[in-house]
């Protein structure tokens, strides 16, 4: 298989605290260039350009730039979105507000929920299609034009056209979209069935509303970034990460902007799947601890788990395929505090990039997880990134003592240790959510730890959860950026049938699968991005008649038969619930096809590139320092420079492994080895305590 070595390849990921860049550059020392710069919240494009400059990368000399952005996610969470109007079927304007049976508060007549589109911007027109796609009421075209005029007068920038049962017959929606664009060419227009051709009008409507609300925001951002790159000589197509773990050409990204929500965590899981599988661990739990939060995911047989049900917040379900990631508010910048009851809390509030942890010297005054690691000797105060004004360890310890230690009657060191214990407990809970809660024993997986802070906590987390192996990739602090580099192009398609197998026309299933694949192939070819091949992954959503929950069933290549569908569903249902229900009819609900443009593989060894390798592990030791460990207290601990470790280097804990983008803690009783791809493989003595 060929390797992507022609030219320079750049992956750049924007996180809540840092913007990370990796450039595979054959002309650079070690074949790689790296950068980590503070995220520019006001305009993320500035941070991307700053990262290129910091890495010494000339955009005009780059073969491909792949970008992961939090623009859409942040816009939704902060409600800094475009003013959006809705044109919907008469009688259904309040679907987006009524939702399902859940409510933001358990008691009271009102809650704090505010729909993404306020009621005065939700307008109705006469039209009606039934669930079989039959037209009951013709589309009132004059009503559509009147609604367009009203929304324009109300200051809308974006419009959603969302009609009942449009998944079964798109004719009315398509005609209405034509009318909107003719009457209002400058508006951003979203058709619900184009974003999600699936039943359930509430989820389809909210997903389309999210797309419309962030579409102008993402388009403006990508235009700014593309313009800045062009000024620096970049003439190729910019690729953008999506939440499904694939990439899309920037020119198409804004049309389906909702697909970029949660793309940052997805890129990390994609990199983890790529790297862990190559290291011999196709089953892995991913653990990404950054500056603001921690993201945990599951990889099974080398593939990340994909789901299509994300509730970004109450009343905002997003039903497009996304890498399944569980997020908690525990990152390096998470603030530790004493609550009203006198108890120690850690997160979810974060110091962010500004002012950041106390030790960054940017004016931060609240103790964070990073500050606790510094006080306990796990971080080197002289090698912290992005420090504006140096702050001594004693200064940080004094603040932890005053804010945490004194109220609890603890020393500064004891208080810092307590901060780490609580943070680790929260992270262990997240791991249990993606493993035990879904029928997977974490002891059967490796823990793949990355992010700027992940390797600091990974071995303690593995010990707590009895996970026998920890994989620390070559560049843990920029793994999300590496995910951008290794990700394939991807486009997802869905159609609803919602038909019992006994009544199903299997030829219709085959036809829809072929149409989905053809649409994906055409889109990838239109993107004009070099790929080795195009492949399709098919799956179906099924349930037993009368059930509300749906089970995703993967299909092999080729066209499935009815007996094959029934057998695969029965097997999947047994594996998930250990129940057989032969007396109830199975129902095929949705057909899914993911079409991937497989890009040339990236040689992982290039990511570990270094011209500083020593002959032995001992020669890579650059010093020693006093480090606190659970159960033993302070130990005089060797510090290894990771860039100097030779391939095959093996050593026992306690140890600190320092590198440009992260610090790894190896606990007493654990052992580590560096493999050929630069991964640090840690063996945890399960059942032993330190």
Residue ranges: model-predicted function:
Residues 11-14, 18-22, 33-44, 63, ...:
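Conserved phosphate-binding loops in N-terminal lobes of ATP-dependent enzymes
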């Amino acid at each position: 298989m060929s390797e992507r070595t022609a030219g320079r390849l750049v992956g750049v990921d924007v996180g809540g605290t840092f913007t990370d860049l990796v450039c595979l550059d054959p002309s650079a020392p070690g074949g790689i260039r790296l950068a980590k710069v503070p995220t520019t919240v006001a305009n993320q494009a500035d941070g991307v350009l700053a990262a290129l400059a910091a890495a010494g990368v000339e955009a005009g000399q780059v073969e491909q730039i792949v970008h992961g952005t939090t623009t859409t996610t942040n816009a939704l969470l902060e409600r800094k979105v475009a003013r959006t109007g809705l044109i919907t079927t008469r009688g259904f304007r309040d679907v987006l507000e009524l939702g399902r049976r859940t409510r933001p508060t358990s008691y009271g007549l009102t809650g704090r929920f505010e729909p993404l589109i306020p009621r005065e911007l939700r307008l109705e027109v006469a039209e009606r299609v039934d669930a079989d796609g039959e037209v009951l009421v013709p589309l009132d075209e004059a009503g559509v034009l009147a609604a367009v005029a009203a929304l324009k007068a109300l200051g809308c920038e974006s419009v959603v056209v969302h009609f009942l049962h449009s998944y079964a017959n798109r004719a009315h929606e398509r005609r209405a979209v034509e009318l909107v664009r003719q009457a209002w060419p400058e508006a951003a227009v979203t058709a619900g069935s184009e974003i999600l051709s699936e039943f359930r009008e509430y989820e389809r409507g909210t997903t389309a509303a999210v797309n419309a609300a962030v579409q102008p925001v993402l388009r403006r951002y990508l235009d700014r970034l593309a313009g800045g790159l062009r000024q620096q000589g970049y003439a190729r197509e910019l690729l953008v990460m999506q939440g499904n773990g694939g990439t899309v050409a920037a020119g198409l990204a804004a049309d389906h902007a909702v697909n970029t929500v949660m793309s940052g965590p997805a890129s990390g899981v994609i990199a983890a799947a790529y790297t862990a599988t190559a290291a011999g661990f196709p089953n892995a739990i991913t653990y990404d601890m950054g500056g603001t939060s921690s993201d945990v995911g599951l990889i099974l047989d080398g593939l990340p788990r994909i789901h299509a049900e994300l509730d970004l917040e109450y009343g905002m379900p997003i039903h497009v395929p996304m890498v399944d990631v569980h997020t908690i508010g525990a990152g390096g910048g998470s603030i530790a505090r004493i609550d009203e009851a006198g108890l120690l809390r850690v997160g979810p509030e974060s110091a962010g990039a500004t002012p950041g942890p106390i030790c960054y010297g940017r004016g931060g005054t609240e103790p964070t997880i990073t500050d606790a690691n510094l006080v306990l000797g796990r971080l080197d105060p002289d090698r912290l990134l992005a420090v504006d004004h140096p702050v001594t360890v004693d200064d940080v310890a004094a603040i932890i003592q005053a804010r945490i230690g004194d109220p609890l009657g603890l020393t500064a060191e004891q208080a810092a240790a307590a901060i780490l214990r609580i943070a680790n407990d929260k992270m262990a809970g997240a791991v249990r959510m993606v493993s035990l809660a879904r029928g997977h024993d974490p002891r059967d997986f490796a823990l793949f730890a990355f992010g700027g802070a992940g390797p600091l906590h990974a071995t303690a987390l593995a010990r707590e959860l009895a996970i026998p192996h920890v994989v620390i990739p070559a560049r843990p602090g920029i793994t999300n950026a590496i995910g951008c580099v290794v990700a394939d192009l991807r486009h997802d398609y869905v159609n609803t049938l919602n038909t019992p197998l006994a009544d199903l026309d299997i030829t219709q299933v085959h036809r829809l699968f072929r149409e989905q694949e053809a649409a994906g192939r055409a889109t990838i070819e239109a993107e004009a991005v070099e790929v080795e091949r195009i492949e399709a992954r098919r799956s179906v959503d099924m349930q037993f008649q009368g059930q509300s929950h749906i089970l995703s069933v993967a299909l092999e290549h080729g066209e499935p038969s009815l007996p094959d569908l029934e057998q695969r569903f029965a097997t999947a249902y047994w594996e998930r619930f250990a129940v057989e229900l032969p007396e109830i009819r199975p129902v095929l609900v949705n057909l899914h096809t993911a079409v991937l443009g497989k890009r040339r593989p990236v040689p992982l060894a290039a990511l570990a590139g270094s011209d500083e390798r020593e002959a032995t592990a001992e020669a890579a030791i650059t010093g020693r320092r006093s480090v606190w460990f659970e159960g033993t207290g302070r130990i005089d601990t060797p510090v290894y420079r990771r860039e100097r470790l030779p391939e095959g280097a093996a050593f026992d804990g306690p140890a600190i492994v320092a590198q440009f983008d992260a610090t790894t803690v190896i606990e007493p009783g654990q052992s580590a080895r560096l493999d050929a791809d630069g991964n640090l493989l840690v063996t945890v003595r399960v059942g032993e305590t330190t």
